[in-house]
Amino acid sequence: MLQATSKRNAKEIIEDMILYYGTYESKSKDKVNDLLEELEDVDSSKAKQWDEIMKYWQTNHEKLEINNDVLPDGLDKSDKLCIVVLGYQLNDDGTMQDELIGRLKVALDSANKYPNAYVACTGGGTAKDNSNVTEADQMAQWLIDNGLNKDRLIIENKSSSTVENAKFTYNILRKKYIDIDKIAIVTSDYHIERGSLLYKAQLVLSAAKNNDKSIQIVSNAAYQAHKDSEPFLWQAGGLCEILGDVKLANKIYDEKYTKPKL
């Protein structure tokens, strides 16, 4: 007597999607679509969420426009927009590296262009020899010192990674700034693609979990760091972190994961 084949759970299917697209990029689109159909049969709610995330990932990777130095024209001019500035490793003594100051200059120019927008500074304590400072607090003080009204600032100073940046920023916005429904990402040019993707995924999943409206990523502005692009696989690793599979994420970062067969 033949036994019915047991269905895989949603997490297994989602991880497969991440691995296929992270490994094969556009060559895996048909496989990703098949996996979305499989996910639909298992959990239609998660299928809807991950369909949105995967479509964003594909478009973000293939058609992303990066705006250097300042946010573009045409964004919402109200206080429903939040400019989110991603932090960067502090010097051992707690001072900011030039790259982080470069991101802040882009953020300040963007904030001056959109004077009603909030500005969120993100990043926890990363100074080896100074546990009293955080990236976000240092960033906020620099912006105040350079003319930004402190009432426009939102500070997320607990995170230790881009994944946590996204999660904790969402929590603050939904608890204290419920009218904000759009964000624009400010970070270094090589980090825009991954940062935007991880924020998108976290925003979609958090909104679904809390039965809340989703906050949309509407644009970006980049500090030109003149560094090599981040490995594409890191985006897959970040998504696995968001799923809660840190072990698989680390294997992806180290390129020691088992590649799926296309």
What residues fall within each predicted segment?
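Extended hydrophobic blocks
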Residues: 1-82, 89, 167-262
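Short loop/turn segments at strand-loop or loop-helix junctions that form parts
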Residues: 83-89, 121-124
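Surface-exposed cleft-lining segments at the edges of enzyme active sites
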Residues: 89-96, 128-129, 152-155
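Histidine-anchored nucleotide/phosphate-binding helix
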Residues: 97-116, 169
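Short, solvent-exposed amphipathic alpha-helices that sit
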Residues: 102-110, 131-143, 194-205
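Early exported N-terminus immediately downstream of N-terminal targeting peptides
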Residues: 112, 116-127
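A non-catalytic structural micro-motif
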Residues: 118-120, 140-158, 204-222
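Short phosphate-binding loop-to-helix
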Residues: 157-170
